[in-house]
């Protein structure tokens, strides 16, 4: 079994790690950074991922996709999708299956597909470091992700060419990294406030056992929401000062978004910052500049309710675990937003204890995923991870009631069966509608899917016995079966959301990803070939000018001919042809090298001769002498 990489697929940034010996290690990307922006851009048919996509976002906002994790596994009618549509510059559209997709340059992409581009970048980063192909991964998701979101994340891995061995909850991964080298038994809380989601998990750890007691959270609460509050503040302040509303200007909005994120980070260590954006817009009177002084106190006032919103899930998680805040022995902070002093203050106040800041909040989740990868491929032993399902699972029964089969915070993997019956006389088929959530009525919860059990023998209502079994695997993905005990008829399915990607769609996306990978590789080869050719043309022309008088007319003609031939193909799209002409010019220009060497040798020889003359002259000494014989 090869190396299993651990990937933290984040809303704002992503990170990849691997077990190296007995320790997990974060792998730097090609830009030398330990995290990669979860941003994809499309520019004139070319796909950019990570930092390169982020750099051009200001000039290409409509074709730059970020925070797509907040859309993954969601239906287009989801209120959170509507909320997202109001704040992102790119186009969110309804897919044929009812899911929320993004449309860029006239082409629709599923959130799983966009996420796959980021996962491919993580995969390449690991492969470049390890020097070998990587095919298996552990990918993290927010603990409060539902089945549809987990399935969509697994699909993203498949599209990226990865076998996803395990989907692991982010706080659980962080706890693994925190407790990996510790043997003491402790009850800890992991408070994870990232770019787009919030989770809190309560765990008991000790002697290599990591047992999740409860989890809670909000899959639409994170740094993006904090940025939006600052963005709104800047827009309103500028409108008050200039009378201009920047909401309908995508370029200005992108600049404001970047400025908001930068100001938020600066105010974690400073009390005040200046936001200066020259030429933000223009009107009839000329260009307008934005210059706003922004303080930490103003920021805290803007986001106070968002911070407070994270405390209620902490309260619920403690209650579900049967614990009090005073029972928690360590509070581990995860996610970039936990660097904010006001966030730390609120968490410290709730738990009534000092916070553990000994882990890097941006990297700890990927490190934990790498450890889990090590467990799965037997590199790491003596670790047992017991996670839970975040939401209750059940079916719709008579009157639209949600009947739970598996309660939230049940340890997974888990299996539970319950017997139901028919609602009408002589009913020959039943529809099993599967839901996930905590509301009492099925319609108020998330519908995961449905299937039919047919061929039930005619009988009065209430007589047939239909056994429904829920089976949750270690990834938190649900499998459901229904069996008529009398006839033995059984229907078994892995639940897929009513939307979601079909196997055929995933297969097509895998092929597209492979094709794109080949095209990207060819494009890179072409760029490198053109750069090498351009560099050679420049150096050859320069040296030809300096040493043309030292070349024979035949050699000079050969170099000029090869030079013209390379220039003629420089704009072509054929990398092999450019390489061929580059090699020809390299061979021809060796004559210039010989001429340069000869010229330098001749100059050296002339210098030596001159030196010898000088030396021999220096040995002649003028002296006065006396002719003794004449005396």
UniProtKB/Swiss-Prot annotation:
Region annotated Disordered, chain positions: 599-631
Presence of keyword Heme: no
Keyword Chaperone attributed: yes
Modified-residue entries (Phosphothreonine), positions: 197
GO terms for MF: ATP binding; ATP-dependent protein folding chaperone; unfolded protein binding
Gene induction: By stress conditions e.g. heat shock.
UniProt feature, compositional bias: Low complexity: 603-612
UniProt KW keywords: ATP-binding, Chaperone, Nucleotide-binding, Phosphoprotein, Stress response
Domain of life: Bacteria
InterPro entries (UniProt xref): ATPase_NBD, Chaperone_DnaK, Heat_shock_70_CS, HSP70_C_sf, HSP70_peptide-bd_sf, Hsp_70_fam
Classification via HAMAP family: DnaK
Family label: Belongs to the heat shock protein 70 family.
Function, in words: Acts as a chaperone.
PANTHER family in the record: HEAT SHOCK PROTEIN 70KDA
Name under which the protein is recorded: Chaperone protein DnaK
Lineage: Bacteria, Pseudomonadati, Pseudomonadota, Alphaproteobacteria, Rickettsiales
């Amino acid at each position: 079994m090869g190396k299993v990489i651990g990937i933290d697929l984040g809303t704002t940034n992503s990170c990849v790690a691997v077990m190296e010996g007995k320790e997990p290690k974060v792998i730097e990307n090609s830009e030398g950074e330990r995290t990669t922006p979860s941003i994809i851009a499309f520019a004139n048919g070319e796909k950019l991922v990570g930092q390169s996509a982020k750099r051009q976002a200001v000039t290409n906002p409509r074709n730059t996709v970020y925070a797509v994790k907040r859309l993954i596994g969601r239906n287009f009618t989801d209120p959170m999708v509507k909320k997202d549509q109001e704040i992102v510059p790119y186009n969110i559209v309804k897919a044929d299956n009812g899911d929320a997709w993004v449309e860029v340059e006239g082409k629709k992409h599923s959130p799983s597909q966009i996420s796959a581009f980021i996962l491919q970048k993580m995969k390449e980063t690991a492969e470049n470091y390890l020097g070998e192909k990587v095919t298996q991964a552990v990918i993290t998701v927010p603990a409060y992700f539902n089945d549809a979101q987990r399935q969509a994340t697994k699909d993203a891995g498949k599209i990226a060419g990865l076998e996803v061995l395990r989907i692991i909850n982010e706080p659980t991964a962080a706890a693994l990294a925190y407790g990996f080298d510790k043997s003491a038994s402790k009850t800890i809380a992991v408070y994870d406030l990232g770019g787009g989601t919030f989770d809190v998990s309560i765990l008991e750890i000790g002697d290599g056992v990591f047992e999740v007691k409860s989890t809670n959270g909000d899959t639409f609460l994170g740094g993006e929401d904090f940025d939006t509050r600052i963005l709104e503040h800047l827009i309103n302040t500028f409108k008050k000062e200039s009378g201009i509303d920047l909401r309908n200007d995508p370029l200005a909005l992108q600049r404001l978004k970047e400025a908001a994120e930068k100001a938020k980070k600066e105010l974690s260590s400073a009390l005040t910052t200046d936001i200066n954006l020259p030429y933000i817009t223009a009107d009839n009177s000329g260009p307008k500049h934005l210059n706003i002084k922004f303080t930490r106190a103003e920021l805290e006032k803007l986001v106070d309710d968002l911070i407070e919103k994270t405390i209620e899930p902490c309260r619920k998680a403690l209650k579900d675990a049967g614990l009090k805040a005073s029972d928690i022995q360590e509070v581990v902070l995860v996610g970039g937003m936990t660097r904010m002093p006001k966030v730390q203050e609120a968490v410290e106040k709730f738990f009534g204890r000092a916070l553990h800041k000994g882990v890097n909040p941006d990297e700890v989740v990927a490190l934990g995923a790498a450890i889990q990868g090590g467990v799965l491929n037997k590199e790491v032993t003596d670790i047992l991870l017991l996670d839970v399902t975040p939401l209750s699972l059940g079916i719709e029964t008579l009157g639209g009631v949600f009947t739970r089969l598996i309660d939230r915070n049940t340890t997974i993997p888990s299996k539970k069966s319950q017997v139901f019956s028919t609602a009408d006389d002589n009913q020959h088929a039943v529809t099993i509608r599967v839901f996930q959530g905590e509301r009492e009525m099925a319609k108020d919860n998330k519908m995961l899917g449905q299937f039919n059990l047919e061929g039930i023998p005619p009988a009065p209502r209430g007589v047939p016995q239909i056994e429904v079994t829920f089976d949750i695997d270690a990834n938190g993905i649900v499998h459901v079966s229904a069996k008529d005990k009398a006839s033995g008829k059984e229907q078994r399915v892995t639940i897929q959301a009513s939307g979601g990607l079909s196997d055929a769609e995933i297969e097509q996306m895998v092929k597209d990803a492979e094709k794109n990978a080949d095209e990207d590789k060819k494009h890179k080869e072409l760029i490198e070939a053109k750069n090498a050719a351009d560099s050679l043309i420049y150096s050859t022309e320069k040296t030809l000018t300096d040493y043309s008088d030292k070349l024979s007319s035949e050699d000079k003609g050969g170099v000029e001919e090869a030079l013209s031939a390379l220039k003629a193909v420089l704009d072509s799209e054929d990398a092999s042809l450019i390489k061929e002409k580059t090699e020809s010019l390299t061979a021809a220009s060796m004559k210039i090298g010989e001429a340069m060497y000869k010229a330098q040798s001749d100059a050296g020889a002339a210098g030596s001769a001159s030196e010898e003359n000088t030396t021999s002259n220096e040995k002649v000494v003028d002296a006065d002498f006396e002719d003794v014989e004449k005396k």
